[in-house]
Regions:
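A transmembrane-helix-recognition feature enriched in membrane-embedded lipid enzymes
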Residues: 1-57, 109-110
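Conserved H-X4-D acyltransferase segment
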Residues: 5-12, 41-97
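Mid-sequence acidic-hydrophobic segments that form the walls
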Residues: 23, 92, 113
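Short alpha-helical
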Residues: 35, 80, 102
Length: 115
């Protein structure tokens, strides 16, 4: 069952990255706003957490003020941090990422569209 879940997850991450990444890029260039691509990214995070069978418990959301600038830092225990932040953080935000990630075909363009 574990192998089946892994195959399902990797299939889902590839296709969700292509479909939602392309959607984010198209929405950015047609609306010239970051809100629509961010919504695609949030969905991408939720879909991939679901496909992996991961449940995320978030504590302290009452301390998040969307009206004040803030820096959110993940401890980056795994790449699931990315999915969790996208799926659970209730504010629109921008990423800092290493240069190599922007060279990945669909992902790099989608990351640029997200700001």
């Amino acid at each position: 069952m574990k192998t089946l879940r892994s195959v399902f997850f990797y299939f889902t991450i590839v296709w969700s990255t292509i479909v939602l990444g392309a959607s984010a890029v198209i929405l950015f260039y047609t609306t010239l706003k970051h809100a629509a691509p961010h919504a695609c990214s949030r969905l991408w995070g939720k879909v991939n957490l679901w496909a992996a069978g991961v449940q995320v418990e978030v504590k302290g959301l009452e301390n998040v003020d969307s009206l004040k600038p803030c820096i959110y830092a993940a401890n980056h225990q795994s790449w699931f941090d990315i999915f969790a932040i996208l799926a659970k953080l209730p504010v629109q935000f921008r990423w800092l990422a290493k240069e190599e990630l922007f060279k990945i075909p669909v992902l790099g363009i989608a990351m640029t569209a997200n700001g």
